[in-house]
Amino acid sequence: MSSRNAKLLYRHLEAENAQDLNGTLATLHPDCVFQDHATGQLWRGHSGAADHYRQWWTTFDVTVERLADQSAGWPDENTFIAEAAWKGRHVGEFLGIPASGRDILQRFVVVVGFQDGLMTSERFHYDLASLLRQTGSNVVPDIGSLPYSIMSA
């Protein structure tokens, strides 16, 4: 584990949980890539990362937490893998589903890459159907038409 990367990750999570876009972007490499495997979306660069965070922050008022039964580790100095959870409330439209005001606790796995002292990638894996049920929906929407969809290409 690189202590520099661990400190950067901590700064990133503090900024992300505070919904501080400038602070969050300051931890990211200019060529960063974010991939949401559940929705099939891919964002590139600071502009894409900003859109990624805005999408989530206007939809869910959540913090990223690691629960007691979850683990994390560094398989090498430039890769961090963690089980974590989004904990909060559904406050805005998500995949065409209006804000429900419901509480959510969504477990996920994230793989984070590092290069040149910055985060280069985040790859998210989670159960979309579980998240949709927590918003009050049992219908999986057409995710191929989402902005940044890799499925519509």
Q: Where do the PLM segments sit?
A:
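C-terminal and inter-domain tail/linker signature
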Residues: 1-153
